[in-house]
Structures are given as structure tokens and as C-alpha cells.
Amino acid sequence: MQKVLIANRGEIVIRIANTCKKLGFIPCGIYSDADKNALHIKYCEETLDIGGSYPNENYLNMDRIIDAAKKMDCDFIHPGYGFLAEKSEFAKQCTDGGFIFIGPSFKVLELSGNKVLAKQVASTIAPVAEGKEVSRLDESIELADKIGYPVILKATKGGGGRGLRALNTVNDLKKSFNISKKEAASSFGSDKVYIEKYIENPRHIEVQILGDKSSSNIIHLGERECSIQRRNQKLIEETPSSALTDETRDLLIKMAVSIMKEIKYDNAGTVEFLYKDGKFYFMEINSRIQVEHAITEEVTGIDIVEQQLDIASGKGLLLEQDKIKAKGHAIECRINAENPFTFTPCPGTVKQFLAPKNNKNIRIDSSLYSGYAIPPFYDSLLAKIISNGKNRKESIENMRQALLSFRISGIPSTIPFHVSALNDDRFLHGVYDTSFINNMKYYSDKDSEIAAAIFVHLPKRIQYVQNKDEINLWLLSKYNSFFNPEGTFYYNNIMRWAN
């Protein structure tokens, strides 16, 4: 049996390991000193401690990961998402070390990871926002004046929504330019940055692609709407997008497939676009499995990790485009260990974690358990809740019920935000964009009324809490999470996440 080293941590390791076992591969894992009690270790047949706590000591340390793969005699290396997943140097080290990298080739990663080169290729197929790479402040000021403010300053080799700065004035640019170059160098290994026209409040829509260079077969699995974001990082995704007509969807998919064919893409990846006033703008290529891949799996019935393994192992991409039929609607909520108002990471120990069991309408991808101490060194993602239904309305209701049955205590989480977001009229009507969070209403002017309503219903559910001091009324009163669109009070579930 062949071994697959999953060079990552947390829920994505568990997700990949389950498919490895299903297909007859042996999943192997790594863990840091900070992750010695992590749940993903138990889902791997073999594991190795690669030491350290900070990412550059372990999950970003190519030499330690390659050494671990050799010690466990692995055949494949799956990078998951984040960390080294889109690093062309890592893919090359894997290949040079005699391992099969489960992802695109070194050359494709080099192209797709360079935002300037990727835009050059895409510009022959799809509209792109005006801009270019800049090396000096005076050059950047001249370009920004030419294309007009606001502009966005990005790391040329950046990704994952990190290091982006929207700038409204020349003073903003002067303050940010050198800082951005330093951040780009420390985070992505290159201080190169580029400036482009900032498209304000667009919708963010991506297309899931599978490619097999051995047969030149490129197919799509539909689009995903990813417009609800904080700090340019996604919080809620859904498929299909409510923004698209059949005509605009066909155009979007045609452009995405053509771009991936042009670069001879191999394995799983996505092409991301901004959508504003009926026009698409190419954004970037994500050359890895996405955090939100599960909603595509729910509507298509296709295991994307299985396809990755089939392609990498030489079995090939056997799916035929005309036989892929998406059914229903799916939503994903990313539950993070964060303050739900400021989205500030809040590591700590989970006192209690209760989640609904997976069923035909709800899927939970998580590495959380009661008593787990969340390390402060890594991403704040705790769990992904995926709901599906025959239509969007049913999928939303299934997600609401799942959120209200969750229990995470001991640390703050973004569950109150998600419940509130799913009750927002803009989301319910599918007419939202990337400014969604900035314009959310928290009803802070009705604190007294909401607090009174809570106290009225408190005696009925008091058995859910042992200590009344655990109830944070400020948190409860700031959100309209406890009211559905018809105004019914959700008192039955308040105490499940009141603290």
C-alpha cells in the first residue's frame, strides 16, 4: 500500500486522511510541539513530530517535511491548503526528493503564484483590473495617479487574502509602500508588489477546476460565491451563486476553463473573479484544494480529494463534463476562534464542544474536541459547517438549525456572527457583496429591549447554565441573532452559546 504524507494540520488532514483510507492509501501525518494533542494525529496511520511551535519551524519548514516523508517511506505528499500548498519551491523539493506532489507542477505553481504573470496570461481571455508591478514609490505614485484612486497594493507572490491594502489617497500610498514591501518579503519570500485599480464592493466568485495534463482534460465543477469576508478572507461561501444568470454563469465558466487550459493546469484548483455591474474581472488562480471545497462536493457528489489522488497516482481524470450535474444548494460557515465583533483571534482551551452529527443535510469538518487547547501560532479556524438542501431557502434553514445546535464554550467563536448574517435581509435575498460585514446592523440602539426579552425567557432555559455570571448580555444584546425574519425569538438555544 502506498503512503501519503499530509503536510498540514487540523481539519484538512482529517479530511484528506479519510479519503486516503477509502482508496487504500496509508495516510501519514506530521505535528509540531504545539500540536502534540491535535486530533489530526489520531486519523493518520503514522505520524512524526517535526518540532517547534512557530510555523517556520514546522509546517513551513520544507527540509523537515521532506525529511519526515523519507523517514516514513512515503510515496506522495499532499500539501492541503495554506502553509506550503502553493509554494513552487516546495513542489520542486518534493519531486526532486522522489515524491509525487499532489498538486500542480512546479512550473504551473511558479506561474500561477506570480500575480503579474497570471494576469498577463488571463488578460488574453478575461478582463483584468488595470495595474502593474512597481519597484519604487515614485513609480507607484505615478501609476496610481494614472489609473485613479482607490487602488489596491498587493504582494506579487501573495495569496490567501493576506497583505492586501486598499488605498484612497496618495498619502495612504506613501505610508503603506515600504511597509507592504517588507511584509511581502517576510511572508512570501519576495518584496515585489504591484498596484491595480481597486474595484469597490464587488462580488467574489470562483470556479472549481480539475485538470489532468496527461490527457489535456480540463473540467469544471461549477462556481462558488465567496463575498462575505473579513480582512479579505472568506467566512461564508455558497453554491450556486445567486448573482448569476445562466448566461453570465456560462461566460464565467468558459473564461475559467480557458485560462486553465492556457497554462496546462494539473490537479485541483480555482480561478477567482470579481463581479461588478455585470462585468467579471480576473483576480487570481488558487493552485490547491480550497477550504470551501466541501460545498462543491455536496452539490456534485464528487470527492475532490479522491480526484486529486487519482490524477496524481496516474489513474487520471475520468470524469466527463456532460455527466456532471449539480443538484440543490450548499452553504459553508467557517467557525473561527475569534471575537465575533472584531474578528480578533482568541486562542485558549475549549471547555465544551458539541456539534450536530453528520447527516444528509449537514456535514461538519472539524478537528475540535472538548478540552483541546488551541495554539496561538496558527490559523483560527475551528470547524466548517456545511449545509445543503433542495434549494437555497432550505439550505439556509438547515444551516440555521446547525448553528443553533452548536456548543463551543471556554473561548469566543464566530457563531453569533454567522447566525446574525444568515438572518440579514441582504443575505436572505442574495443581494450582498464584499462590503457585507461593514454594513451589518447590530441593533446596538435596542439593547434594553433585547436584554429585557432575554430576561423574560431566561427562567425557561436556566438549566442550561450553572453560573448566571457566564451569560454575557452585552454579546447577546448586540446581535439580532435571536430573531428570525418573522421576528420570532430564538430563546430555546440562547444558552448553548451565551458564554
Which residues fall in each region the model found?
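N-terminal beta-alpha lobe that positions the nucleotide/phosphoryl donor
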Residues: M1-V271, Y275-Q290
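Short, contiguous acidic/charged loop-to-helix segments that flank catalytic cores in large enzymes
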Residues: A243-E247, I295-T300
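Exposed boundary/loop context
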Residues: K3, D73-D75, T156, K182, ...
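Catalytic cores of soluble metabolic enzymes centered on carboxylation/carboxyl-transfer
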Residues: A256, T296-E297, I302-N499
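Short loop/turn segments at secondary-structure transitions that flank enzyme active sites
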Residues: S227, V291, A337-F341
